[in-house]
């Protein structure tokens, strides 16, 4: 049984490897990123920019790698989940890094204004 699981995981890795994006920067929880997303409206396709704080990250080295991004549109906080290896994601750029001591920053949902700021890391 164990040998079958090992063979299956190797098969999955060999199938996923060509589909994964290699030019993605290192993204950590707490980073402020700008993400380009292809949006189809009718017959036209345009690129939509989304900028916000990364609240969580799941499955780091997999085809299903996703992150939860908290943006604010017109004064309202919006959270979206993005799959990083999706063909709809055109680019990811890290704008600012922050020092955080948690793996998930869900507590930022309840904070307003200056309280929701994170301590910035200067490189």
UniProtKB/Swiss-Prot annotation:
It is found in: Plastid, Chloroplast. The keyword Chloroplast applies. The keyword Ribonucleoprotein applies. It holds the Pfam family Ribosomal_L19. GO terms for cellular component: chloroplast; mitochondrial large ribosomal subunit. Keywords: Chloroplast, Plastid, Ribonucleoprotein, Ribosomal protein. GO terms for molecular function: structural constituent of ribosome. Gene3D superfamilies: 2.30.30.790. SUPFAM superfamilies: Translation proteins SH3-like domain. InterPro entries: Ribosomal_bL19 (IPR001857), Ribosomal_bL19_CS (IPR018257), Ribosomal_bL19_sf (IPR038657), Translation_prot_SH3-like_sf (IPR008991). GO terms for biological process: translation. HAMAP family: Ribosomal_bL19. Belongs to the bacterial ribosomal protein bL19 family. This is Large ribosomal subunit protein bL19c.
